[in-house]
Amino acid sequence: MPPVPFYHDKKLFSGSIAVNAHSMYWVTFTLTPSMQKIRVTGHFQTYGGRQNDIQAVICSDEDFINFRNGHQAQVVYDSGKTTVGDINTTIPDGGGKYVLAFNNSFSMLSGKTVNGEVTLGYEILGQP
C-alpha cells in the first residue's frame, strides 16, 4: 500500500510577549526532510509606543544571523512595520532550521506587546 499524507501542526507562538526597545523576540523551529507542504499561518497584533508597530519575519537560521545584525537576508515572510498582521506563507521542502522573529530593534524608546498565535503546519507520508 502506498504511503498517505498525515497532517501535523505545532504552535510556534501563542499568547502575549513583551519586546523591549532595540530588541527582538524569536523562536527557532526545525524542519525535517520528511516534512512536506510546509506552511506557517497566524495572526498578531501589537500595542505600545506611538506607532503600535512591530516587524515579523520568517527566515532560515543562517539568514536570521544576517537580519539580526542589520545585513541583507533572504526571508520567506516579512510583514514590514505593522500594527496587525496575518501570516500565511509556505516554506520550501527539504528541512533545515528556521526562525520566526518579532523585531522591535527600530524603536528607540518604546517596548511593544505582541498578542497572537502562529502555527506551523505540514504533512508527513506514512502508512495508513
Question: Where is each model-derived feature located?
Answer:
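Acidic, Ser/Thr/Pro
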Residues: M1-P128
